[in-house]
Amino acid sequence: SIDVTIIEPNEHYYTCYFSNEVISGERKMDSIKFGYDGLKARGINVVQAAAEMIDAEAKTVKAGGKDYPFDRCIVAPGVEMIYDKIEGYSAEVAEKLPHGWKAGKQTEILRDQLAGVKEGGTAVIVAPPNPFRCPPGPYERASQFAGYFKHHNPTAKVIILDSKQKFSKQGLFTQGWEKFYGYGTDDSRIEGQPGPDTAVVRVDADA
């Protein structure tokens, strides 16, 4: 038998899986919310604190003012936004211009903004350059936006700004877009703007 300890600062988490369906109103936030009670019930020690330091020599992790010894340590820090890559963007601005890469509050902001797009309005999605987490993500989200508009705001559209010439699963996405959203026609609900000239270098949340 082994003794397993998970050190995690958050009491619960929201899955990125199915978050698109929350954004389009097909799911509730609670359906993608999970805690750690199931792990606790299986004998796993869950410490609700942030890891502050790892001492590889002493084989300890400091969290919440305590040291936790280990034989093996697996570090899973997740991802963080690199806000300073785009002039004018920050964690504060993300409250107005959501990136949506982390499920939770960002999901709710994006859901509310999608529902608030005016009739005939435009939603802009910026696909980051490679490498980044979940390469199909921006195009999945564009598909979900277009599906929402088709049923709730049929004159609205989605524009994808993408500095890449090619993207993950491109053939499958364009095939679906052509079939369901008129991609490539004058009435397309999705417009792609590929190439280095569409790389986003600055945003103005107040413009």
Model-assigned labels for residue ranges:
Residues 42-53, 58-61, 68, 146-207:
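A Rossmann-like FAD-binding core segment of flavoenzymes
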Residues 46-140, 144-151:
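FAD-binding core/adjacent interface of flavoenzyme oxidoreductases
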Residues 7, 12-27, 105-112, 118-123, ...:
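Conserved N-terminal glycine/acidic-rich loop preference
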Residues 31-36, 75, 100-104, 151-154, ...:
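Short, surface-exposed, polar/charged, turn-prone segments marking secondary-structure boundaries
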Residues 1-45, 129-172:
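Beta1-alpha1 glycine-rich phosphate/pyrophosphate-binding loop at the start
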Residues 37-41, 115, 178:
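Alpha-helix boundary recognition
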